[in-house]
């Protein structure tokens, strides 16, 4: 879980209604990682459910890190509020918060493992 309060102070928040697509698989707009402040977000790849993101969780990091199109679709399962973290802020957090960097690595590792085990 990401410390939402620590990054919320200086980041942009955006609200989504239930059913609204936050980003779609193949999108090339990969300028943000998203931290979920409230609500739930469903992640799916080729319409196959991958993960349900809960408050404090983050998503969209793969496209931000490797500058490739989005590999999945993120849809607001409920009304939700997300914090948008851009490239510069993401790299600042990784460099200045070892705990944040470790969390990102753990989540990436879990997601890769889950996708290769299925």
Placement of each model-derived feature along the sequence:
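Charged/polar, solvent-exposed surface patches and flexible loops
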Residues: 6-9, 92, 110
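Basic side chains
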Residues: 11-14, 70, 111-113
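Short hydrophobic/aromatic patches on the structural cores and recognition surfaces of FHA
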Residues: 19, 39, 56, 74, ...
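Cyclic-nucleotide recognition modules
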Residues: 52-105
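Polybasic "coupling" helices that flank or enter modular domains
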Residues: 106-118
């Amino acid at each position: 879980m990401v410390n939402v309060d620590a990054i919320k102070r200086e980041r942009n928040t955006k609200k989504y209604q239930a059913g609204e697509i936050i980003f779609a698989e193949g999108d090339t707009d990969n300028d943000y990682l998203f931290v979920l402040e409230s609500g739930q977000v469903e992640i799916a790849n080729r319409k196959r459910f991958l993960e349900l993101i809960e408050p404090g969780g983050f998503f969209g990091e793969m496209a931000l890190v490797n500058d490739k199109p989005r590999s999945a679709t993120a849809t607001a399962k409920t009304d939700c509020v997300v914090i948008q973290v851009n490239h510069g802020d993401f790299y600042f957090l990784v460099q200045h918060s070892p705990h944040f960097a470790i969390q990102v690595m753990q989540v990436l590792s879990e997601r890769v493992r889950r996708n290769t085990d299925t």
